[in-house]
From Swiss-Prot:
Domain of life, per lineage: Eukaryota
Acidic residues bias (residue ranges): 106-116
Residues covered by the Peptidase S1 domain: 147-399
Domain Clip: 48-97
Function: Probable inactive serine protease which plays an essential role in the innate immune response against bacteria and protozoa infection by activating the melanization cascade. Binds to the surface of parasite P.berghei ookinetes and bacterium E.coli where it promotes the accumulation of mature TEP1 which leads to the melanization of the microbe.
Subunit structure, as described in the record: Interacts with mature TEP1 and to a lesser extent with full-length TEP1; the interaction is induced by microbial infection.
CDD domains assigned to the protein according to its UniProt record, in alphabetical order: Tryp_SPc (cd00190)
Identification of the protein by name: Inactive CLIP domain-containing serine protease A30
Amino acid sequence: MAFSLRIGIRTTDSKRCLVLLVLVVLLTVLACLPPSVEGNFPVGKFRRCNNNKGICVSREQCLNGQINTVGHTQIEPRLLNDDDIDECDVYGMQCCNLPSTNVPADSDEEEQEEEEKEKKGGTVTTTTTEEPDDPDWSRQCGQRTDVTERADQDGETNRFEFPWSVALFSKAQFFGKVRKEFLCGGTLIDDYLVLTAARCVNQKDRNTLVVQLGRWNLDAGKESRMQEIAVEELIIHRGYVLSSHLHNVALLVLANGAQLGRAANRVCLPDHSVQFGPDTLCYVVGWSNSPSPNTSNRQLKLRSMVAPVQECTATIRRSTGAWDFRLLSENICTTYLDDTVPCERAPGSGFVCESPTLPGQYFLVGIASYAVRQCHKYRAHDVFVHVPDYIEWVDGHVVNQSRQTSFYRPDPISFD
């Protein structure tokens, strides 16, 4: 009897071990499976909400109702009221819509052409409808040719009005087809170099990044005179800090040189010797990260001025409840002169001001770094990286790339 009991116990233990082993194998297999992905955002580990149209995330990950895939805001979440708790039913969490691809799919022929070039090891450089060159376009930095097209709505640029403004995209494969997601704005300073915010490219694979020059309407697919160039190298400031946006600046080295002309030209960079008065009219130029429904995402220009530091600090403190907030010394704030401004502007967009001594010549004074506003609740100043504080950093990397620093300054020494 004792012998039979021992056998029974051993048999039971063996069954338990077998069950545990099967469970371990199943869990291992599940762990190796990739999470479901929509856009560039993994959704498998998040709770679904809004009839599967969104997921529950922390409030600082949700900008204007949509997942923020670029970066996070600097300011801690404000104190919440009972009314702020939604169907996620967790303090500090909210239902946020999943990101969508901002650019329509390219035609099958265009996709095949790009894929063939990449398979051959080449970089993608596309220029659509051929148009004659402009013999009178200025080879000076920061200058534009005469613009005759008129914008349909206030706040929209004319095509090629700011030819140094570029759009940065991330490419991904979806069901065997290439899709591009708009990430950020950027500014051309050399035919091989683009300045943008570090948050736009931090931890990004350079092989997935492309810039488009000569763009106007991001919803229009291909446009005449548009150039698309792959990114060959990312240079992120070594001191960049994600949480505080300290040194939020990066250089993109392009795989091929841009064809400069009416649709694509570089901006000037100012050092501290270039002084802009408090009443200098400037523009924030770029696209919206969250365009309004049933509207095209065309390039915008927002009339702006540099805001006093005290005023900027006060509005951000009031808006966020972060009463110990201090503006970084390498940052500036802008104030908008128009009553109607789009809710969300893309990081990396340029803040350009006209030269005080050379009318018609524009300098890149700031790079859009972050914003803390909630459009329907309050208005606060946007924060920009102050470009003159980074001229030495830019010059050093430009020299390392065997390029000339005079190219983004008035009266370039050489144009080769």
